[in-house]
């Protein structure tokens, strides 16, 4: 369950300054609304960069799946770091859209401002 404005690519993937995208789990309120009408499993998305918060939402049953895109670009080893007890080392997406959306718009591929840090860490988990 998500929110998007497809009038322009820049509006499809909202930056941190977007009025609906200010808090962690910002779109989960839409899951809450959908839940009123169905009991099917719901996948939440939107600013899910805090592993403790994500775990709380899953454990409470608010969502049954957590979807992440930019967060996994920011740190492809997010799950591995959690499993190895290194959650504090996770590079959290800052929703700047500089290289992820910016790369798409410039036809340069999908990247992240953390790419250099991730490359340096590769294999060190």
Locations of regions flagged by a protein language model:
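Flavin-dependent oxidoreductase catalytic cores
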Residues: 1-125
């Amino acid at each position: 369950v998500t929110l998007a404005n497809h009038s322009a690519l820049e509006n499809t993937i909202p930056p941190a300054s977007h009025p609906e995208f200010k808090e962690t789990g910002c779109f989960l309120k839409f899951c809450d609304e959908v839940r009123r009408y169905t009991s099917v499993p719901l996948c939440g998305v939107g600013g899910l960069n805090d592993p403790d918060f994500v775990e709380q939402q899953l454990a409470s049953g608010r969502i049954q799946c957590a979807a992440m895109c930019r967060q996994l670009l920011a740190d492809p080893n997010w799950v591995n770091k959690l499993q190895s007890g290194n959650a504090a080392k996770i590079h959290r997406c800052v929703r700047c859209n500089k290289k992820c959306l910016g790369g798409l718009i410039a036809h340069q591929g999908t990247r992240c401002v953390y790419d250099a840090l991730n490359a340096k860490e590769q294999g060190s988990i």
